[in-house]
Amino acid sequence: MRRGEGPAPRRRWLLLLAVLAALCCAAAGSGGRRRAASLGEMLREVEALMEDTQHKLRNAVQEMEAEEEGAKKLSEVNFENLPPTYHNESNTETRIGNKTVQTHQEIDKVTDNRTGSTIFSETIITSIKGGENKRNHECIIDEDCETGKYCQFSTFEYKCQPCKTQHTHCSRDVECCGDQLCVWGECRKATSRGENGTICENQHDCNPGTCCAFQKELLFPVCTPLPEEGEPCHDPSNRLLNLITWELEPDGVLERCPCASGLICQPQSSHSTTSVCELSSNETRKNEKEDPLNMDEMPFISLIPRDILSDYEESSVIQEVRKELESLEDQAGVKSEHDPAHDLFLGDEI
């Protein structure tokens, strides 16, 4: 029995050793593949880095060559063949990869007619812009900035700036802190849009009694009070437009506002380019009708024609005289169809 049991355990041990050896070989092969894969990735990264460096070097060489070539082309100017007095400006652009080389050239030639001496001048300005034409822009619109800041626009860069305090110079409402508005070029509180001095873009932005007009001292339009009598005003080129009410005027920004109600814009003189607000003819007649008629100032009222006297028919004196005549006629009991005194008073010819 013991002899029969000997070979079986021996075979089991051999089988176990074989399995362990296979597992070790598999593990060794897997680790080798991992090491080979990581080494391949490193080689690829180094290769990509070398290619990027070579690309940058090529771009730098091309830019230098483009600048030299541009300078050669610009310098090939025969000043002797130019006219005695000459001026020229030119701009050229050369695309190199993802960059643009801009060259500005100015050529001047001035000849003194008395002495015959000639002065030559050549100015060359070269600049390089990236392919994406990026500038130092921290923001593009005001919403790009955090609360309490606004986007300040300039030629070369846009930056987020802190909002301005009260009575500080401004050109936009967003520049002022909190609930302030830009009024007459200063940040102020306790104002609402449409009031006197607030910034506007068209006539609908302003309250009644004001109009949207440019101000030379501010360089942007604001809601401006309508001018009164004697003040400069907006005078349309067509005189017939003076009869049109303000509601029918265009909605765009004006250089000057039209006159207030009851006034009309008239030139100061035939040679003057400035117009001022004056009382309209209807308003003048209305004021004259409201004034009591002084008989001492018009001693020859019976000689005034009827059409002129009709302007004063509604005056208090005329009304009182007419009532007296009617009262006398009623008392006499006779109402004559043709009363010479009445006709004489109304200015009929005798």
UniProtKB/Swiss-Prot annotation:
Query: One Pfam annotation, family name?
Result: Dickkopf_N
In residue numbers, the region (Disordered) covers 329-350
Glycosylated residue positions: 88, 98, 113, 196, 282
- InterPro entries assigned: Dickkopf_N, DKK1-4, Dkk3_Cys2, Dkk3_N, Prokineticin_domain
From the UniProt entry, list the residue stretches annotated as the region DKK-type Cys-1.
139-187
* Predominant cellular place of this UniProt entry's protein: secreted
Instruction: Please state the span of the N-terminal signal peptide per the UniProt entry.
Output: 1-29
Query: What GO cellular component term, any one, is given?
Result: extracellular space
Region of interest: DKK-type Cys-2: 200-277
Q: Which GO terms describe its molecular function?
A: co-receptor binding; receptor antagonist activity
* CDD domains xrefs: Dkk3_Cys2, Dkk3_N_Cys1
Its keywords, alphabetically, are: Coiled coil, Developmental protein, Disulfide bond, Glycoprotein, Secreted, Signal, Wnt signaling pathway
Disulfide links within the chain: 200-212, 206-223, 211-257, 233-265
Task: State the tissue distribution.
Answer: Expressed in eye lens.
Q: Which residues form a coiled coil?
A: 33-78
Can the keyword Coiled coil be found in this entry's annotation? yes
What does the UniProt record say this protein does? Antagonizes canonical Wnt signaling by inhibiting LRP5/6 interaction with Wnt and by forming a ternary complex with the transmembrane protein KREMEN that promotes internalization of LRP5/6. DKKs play an important role in vertebrate development, where they locally inhibit Wnt regulated processes such as antero-posterior axial patterning, limb development, somitogenesis and eye formation. In the adult, Dkks are implicated in bone formation and bone disease, cancer and Alzheimer disease.
Domain text from the record? The C-terminal cysteine-rich domain mediates interaction with LRP5 and LRP6.
The UniProt similarity line reads: Belongs to the dickkopf family.
What is the designated name of this protein? Dickkopf-related protein 3
| Source organism of this protein record | Gallus gallus (Chicken)
Q: Which gene encodes it?
A: DKK3
